[in-house]
Amino acid sequence: MALTAEEKQDIIAKYATHEGDTGSPEVQIALLTKRIADLTEHLKFHKHDHHSRRGLLLMVGDRRRLLDYLKKVDIERYRSLIERLGLRR
């Protein structure tokens, strides 16, 4: 269910803007997107898990705020990330 260390490192390596980058908006959004996808799959089988559903909604809100920030700061990085992650916007 949770991200393994290997999965996390793969995502960080794929979306990092420079060596050792773990906090850029791109990396944070990519990690949240993976967690959101995993939790969405969990909720398909456990429809009454309302505690996890609330966590999912909080993560979606966090990702939305990070995407809005990235869009405001650098629209080209935003468009590139949306395309790479396959998010609708």
Curated annotation (Swiss-Prot):
SUPFAM superfamilies: S15/NS1 RNA-binding domain (SSF47060). One of its GO terms (biological process) is translation. Keywords: Ribonucleoprotein, Ribosomal protein, RNA-binding, rRNA-binding. CDD domains: Ribosomal_S15p_S13e. Gene3D superfamilies: 6.10.250.3130, S15/NS1, RNA-binding. Pfam families: Ribosomal_S15. GO terms for cellular component: cytosolic small ribosomal subunit. One of its GO terms (molecular function) is rRNA binding. One of the primary rRNA binding proteins, it binds directly to 16S rRNA where it helps nucleate assembly of the platform of the 30S subunit by binding and bridging several RNA helices of the 16S rRNA. Part of the 30S ribosomal subunit. Forms a bridge to the 50S subunit in the 70S ribosome, contacting the 23S rRNA. Belongs to the universal ribosomal protein uS15 family. NCBIfam families: S15_bact. This is Small ribosomal subunit protein uS15. It comes from Bifidobacterium animalis subsp. lactis (strain AD011).
